[in-house]
Curated annotation (Swiss-Prot):
<dbReference type="GO" id="GO:0005737">
    <property type="term" value="C:cytoplasm"/>
</dbReference>
<comment type="function">
    <text>Actin homolog which is part of a cytoskeletal system involved in disk-shape formation. Could be an early molecular marker for the onset of transition from rods to disks. Volactin is highly abundant in disks.</text>
</comment>
<keyword id="KW-0963">Cytoplasm</keyword>
<dbReference type="InterPro" id="IPR043129">
    <property type="entry name" value="ATPase_NBD"/>
</dbReference>
<keyword id="KW-0133">Cell shape</keyword>
<comment type="subunit">
    <text>Assembles into dynamic filaments. Filaments assemble and disassemble independent of the division site.</text>
</comment>
<feature type="compositionally biased region" description="Acidic residues">
    <location>
        <begin position="334"/>
        <end position="345"/>
    </location>
</feature>
<protein>
    <recommendedName>
        <fullName>Volactin</fullName>
    </recommendedName>
</protein>
<feature type="region of interest" description="Disordered">
    <location>
        <begin position="318"/>
        <end position="345"/>
    </location>
</feature>
<dbReference type="Pfam" id="PF25216">
    <property type="entry name" value="Volactin"/>
</dbReference>
C-alpha cells in the first residue's frame, strides 16, 4: 500500500488505492472560531462536525468552517498562506495536523510510503518552502508514515501525462500559488512557482467590490463561469477580470523562465492545467487563448483540462508513491485504473 497527499492552501486531499479504484478523501484547509458552550459542543459532536475545544473557544475545522463563517458573519482562518504554513497564524500547526489526520488516516502498516505535495520556491517572492516541507515531513513521520515530498507540478505530470511518456508542461493553479513544471520523460527540466493563485483572485475581487472574501470564494466555487457575460460591477464580473490578469501574469513568468533556462526550441509538448482555481467552466479555453498570444519558444500541441482538476495533484502523488514502492520490491501497479467518488471526513 501507498498513499498520495495534496497539502493545498484551500483543500487537503489524500489518494489511496482500493482494488482498481482510486479513493479520494478531502477536507477544506480552514477553520473558524466560535464561543464555547456545553450545548454548542454537544450539537457539533452529534452532527459529526469536525471541531476541537481550546479554553473557552471551539474551533470548527474543515468543510464546515466556511458554512459557519458565512452564518456567523466571520472570516475563516487558514493554517496556510501563499502555499505554505502561515507564519501569521499561531494555530496553524495544530489545525493542519487535525485536518491531515482526518484526511489521510492511519498507515495500513508501519512506515507506509506516502508522497506529499511540495510547492517550488516562488520566483516572484522571497518566500521559502523549506520550513513548510520539513514540518510536514516530521508530522507525517510521527503519524507512522515514510513521507517523501514531490514537487506539485511534477505530480501533475505523473497524474495526467502517462500517455505521453510523462513529457509535457504541467500547471497547477492552486489557491496560494501556481506551480509549473516542464518534464521530459519524467525528468523535470524546469520547475518553479508563482506566489499568486485563487486566493489572490478572491482578495482582489473582494477589495474591488466591497464583498467579504469568504462570500467571493463561495460565489466562485458555486456556479461561476468564465463566459464574460456578467454585469459590470458585480462579483462575477470582477472575478473574470482578475482571472484574466492571473493568466497573463502566469504566462509572462513562464516565458521569462523558459528564456532563462534556455529550453530547446524544438520541443512539441502538451500542456495540462489542473488545480481548484482552474475549475470554472471556460478556464481551459481562456488559458489556451492567452497561450496562443505568448512568445514561448517551444510548440504546444494541445492544452488539456481534466474533469476533476482538484484531485490531480493527490492522484499524481499516489502514482509516484506506488511507482517507488514497486521499484523497492512491492507488487503494486503504478497506474490507478479507476476513480471512486471523493469522500469528505
Amino acid at each position: 500500500m501507498a498513499k498520495g497527499l495534496d497539502v493545498g492552501t484551500m483543500n487537503i486531499l489524500s489518494a489511496s488505492q482500493d482494488g482498481s479504484e482510486t479513493v479520494f478523501v478531502q477536507q477544506r484547509n480552514s477553520f473558524v472560531e466560535i464561543d464555547y458552550s456545553d450545548m454548542a459542543e454537544q450539537m457539533l459532536s452529534r452532527s459529526d462536525v469536525l471541531h476541537i475545544r481550546k479554553d473557552d473557544k471551539v474551533y470548527v475545522v474543515g468543510d464546515d468552517a466556511l458554512n459557519f463563517a458565512n452564518i456567523f458573519g466571520k472570516e475563516t482562518r487558514r493554517p496556510m498562506q501563499h502555499g505554505i504554513l502561515s507564519s501569521e497564524e499561531s494555530s496553524a500547526i495544530p489545525m493542519i495536523k487535525l485536518i491531515i489526520e482526518q484526511v489521510v488516516g492511519s498507515p495500513s502498516r508501519p512506515n507506509e510510503r506516502l508522497f506529499y505535495s511540495s510547492p517550488a520556491d516562488p520566483i516572484d517572492s522571497d518566500l521559502s518552502t523549506l520550513y513548510h516541507d520539513k514540518t510536514l515531513e516530521s508530522m507525517l513521520g510521527d503519524m507512522g508514515y515514510d513521507p517523501e515530498p514531490i514537487n506539485e507540478g511534477m505530480a501533475v505530470i505523473y497524474s495526467e501525462l502517462a500517455d505521453n511518456n510523462f513529457t509535457g508542461l504541467g500547471v497547477s493553479f492552486g489557491a496560494g500559488m501556481t506551480n509549473i513544471c516542464l518534464a521530459y520523460y519524467a525528468v523535470p527540466v524546469m520547475q518553479f512557482s508563482i506566489a499568486r493563485g485563487g486566493d489572490w483572485i478572491d482578495q482582489q475581487t473582494a477589495q474591488a467590490t466591497g464583498t467579504a472574501v469568504d462570500k467571493v470564494t463561495s460565489i466562485k466555487e458555486d456556479d461561476f463561469q468564465l463566459d464574460f457575460r456578467t454585469d459590470v460591477g458585480g462579483v462575477e464580473g470582477a472575478l473574470s477580470i482578475y482571472y484574466e490578469n492571473l493568466l497573463d501574469y502566469v504566462i509572462e513568468n513562464i516565458e521569462r523562465e523558459v528564456d532563462e533556462e534556455d529550453i530547446e526550441e524544438g520541443l512539441d509538448v502538451p500542456v495540462v492545467v489542473t488545480g481548484g482555481t482552474s475549475s470554472p467552466e471556460g478556464f481551459e479555453e481562456l488559458f489556451e487563448h492567452h497561450l496562443e498570444d505568448s512568445t514561448i519558444p517551444f510548440s504546444v500541441n494541445e492544452v488539456r483540462s481534466i474533469d476533476r482538476p482538484l484531485y490531480s495533484v493527490a492522484r499524481g502523488s499516489l502514482v509516484a508513491a506506488r511507482s517507488e514502492e514497486e521499484s523497492d520490491g512491492g507488487a503494486s501497479d503504478p497506474e490507478p485504473e479507476a476513480e471512486a467518488a471523493p469522500e469528505s471526513n
